[in-house]
């Protein structure tokens, strides 16, 4: 069971809504993933009506919506988008995204921290997308963010956990949930994130662009479950030396 702020989730896999070939395929993949928290970009949704092609099927699916501020380049733009989302969707949950460079889509640490502090004060449950910077993640936690979402690699790159060393530090020091976001390309990446101690992962591109998004979503669900179970089972420690799995000495002595 995963708890973030006032909500609990059975699934440790969060999903996105971008890049799917159709809304129907998006919903089928989300259902196959078992995800209960789904993020959507406010710039892609018609907030004036709930029969929007993206919004309506998500509401019907009964998932928790996590609007994000993707497209915002400054703290001010992100805060404006947050208030629009709260008014239109009736939720104070927010994935905070601020990336001024359209080429790399890397989060702006200064603007993100600035916006996060203000949004928390305004009553939002803030989940910030951020770089894998242990100091920044601690600062975001200190200003009241409900979780931190450090990247594994650049958005949509499918490179995996390129920031593993920093993620391990973030996880070790965090007192709020850590959700690895961005760069996860295959189910094994997700399993590794859960094994190393992450509380959840957010996956979008890897599912949406797969030849079979529904089965890929199912694969991610199983990988996350496996990674979590492996961590809870207490894996053996790594060693530089070989250790025999059978006690050969006793066998030889008995045969003598």
UniProtKB/Swiss-Prot annotation:
The keyword Transferase applies. InterPro entries: Aldolase_TIM, Thiazole_synthase_ThiG, ThiG. The active site is at 95 (schiff-base intermediate with dxp). Pfam families: ThiG (PF05690). It is an enzyme of class 2 (transferase). Keywords: Cytoplasm, Schiff base, Thiamine biosynthesis, Transferase. 1-deoxy-D-xylulose 5-phosphate binds at residues 156, 182-183, 204-205. One of its GO terms (cellular component) is cytoplasm. Its EC number is 2.8.1.10. The keyword Transferase applies. Homotetramer. Forms heterodimers with either ThiH or ThiS. Catalyzes the rearrangement of 1-deoxy-D-xylulose 5-phosphate (DXP) to produce the thiazole phosphate moiety of thiamine. Sulfur is provided by the thiocarboxylate moiety of the carrier protein ThiS. In vitro, sulfur can be provided by H(2)S. Belongs to the ThiG family. This is Thiazole synthase. It comes from Shigella boydii serotype 18 (strain CDC 3083-94 / BS512). The gene is thiG.
């Amino acid at each position: 069971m995963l708890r973030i702020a006032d909500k609990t989730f059975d699934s440790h896999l969060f999903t996105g809504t971008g890049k799917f070939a159709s809304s129907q395929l998006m919903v089928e993949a989300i259902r196959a993933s078992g995800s209960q928290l789904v993020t959507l970009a406010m710039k892609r949704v018609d907030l004036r009506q709930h029969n929007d092609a993206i919004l309506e099927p998500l509401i019907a699916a009964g998932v928790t919506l996590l609007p994000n501020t993707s497209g915002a380049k400054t703290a001010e733009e992100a805060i404006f988008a947050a208030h629009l989302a709260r008014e239109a969707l009736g939720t104070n949950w927010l994935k905070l995204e601020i990336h001024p460079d359209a080429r790399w889509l890397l989060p702006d640490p200064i603007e993100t921290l600035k916006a996060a502090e203000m949004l928390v004060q305004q009553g939002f449950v803030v989940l910030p997308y951020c770089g894998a910077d242990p100091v920044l993640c601690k600062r975001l936690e200190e200003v009241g963010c409900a979780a931190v979402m450090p990247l594994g690699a650049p958005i949509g790159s499918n490179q995996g956990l390129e920031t593993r060393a920093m993620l391990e530090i973030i996880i070790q020091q965090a007192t709020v949930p850590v959700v690895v976001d961005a760069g996860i390309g295959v189910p094994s990446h997700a399993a590794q994130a859960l094994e190393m101690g992450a509380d959840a992962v957010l996956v979008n591109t890897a599912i949406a662009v797969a030849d079979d998004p529904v089965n890929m979503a199912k694969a991610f669900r199983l990988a996350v479950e496996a990674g979590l179970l492996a961590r809870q089972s207490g894996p053996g420690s790594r060693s530089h030396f070989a250790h025999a799995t059978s006690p050969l000495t006793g066998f030889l002595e008995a045969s003598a």
